[in-house]
A protein has these predicted regions:
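Conserved beta-strand-loop surface patch within small alpha/beta domains used
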Residues: 1-79, 87-133
Length: 133
């Protein structure tokens, strides 16, 4: 299980900019990098179109999501997680997030009106330590 998520200040700023640019709707994307033991290292946050374009949910564009997985693999990387925003609420998983996390075994980074937090699903939602590098 992932216990730590290391992400650059640059990628944190990119996700925050996505939150602001897409308000009041949720924005989303993928986190590309590597996993070393229980630490996921984000090398790139890649915005992906939210095909739902709503205030309370997101759905990654399937073609862009596939291309991100494909491109990451070609470069010896993985999609280590996904991110999405809660532009008018806190950075905690919603009921929909929790139900979806159970079937999406990766890190979920949520940027909310009150900051940014990371989570994984392991017999329930678990907090992942977010480390800015």
């Amino acid at each position: 299980m992932i216990h730590e998520l290391k992400i650059s200040h640059r990628d944190i700023e990119l996700i925050q900019a996505e939150l602001e640019a897409n308000k009041p709707y949720e924005a989303c994307g993928v986190l590309i990098g590597t996993i070393d033991g229980s630490t996921a290292h984000v090398e790139k946050a890649l915005p992906v179109t939210n095909v739902k374009r709503t205030r309370t949910s997101f759905e990654l564009d399937p073609n862009e999501h596939y291309n991100a997985w494909n491109d990451a693999g070609k470069n010896g990387k993985d999609v280590v997680g996904i991110y999405h925003t809660h532009p008018v609420s806190s950075a905690v998983p919603s009921l929909w997030d929790r139900e979806t996390m159970e079937n999406e075994p990766s890190v979920w980074l949520i940027a909310g009106a009150d900051g940014m937090r990371a989570y994984v699903w392991e017999n329930g939602v678990k907090v992942v330590k977010l480390i800015e590098i």
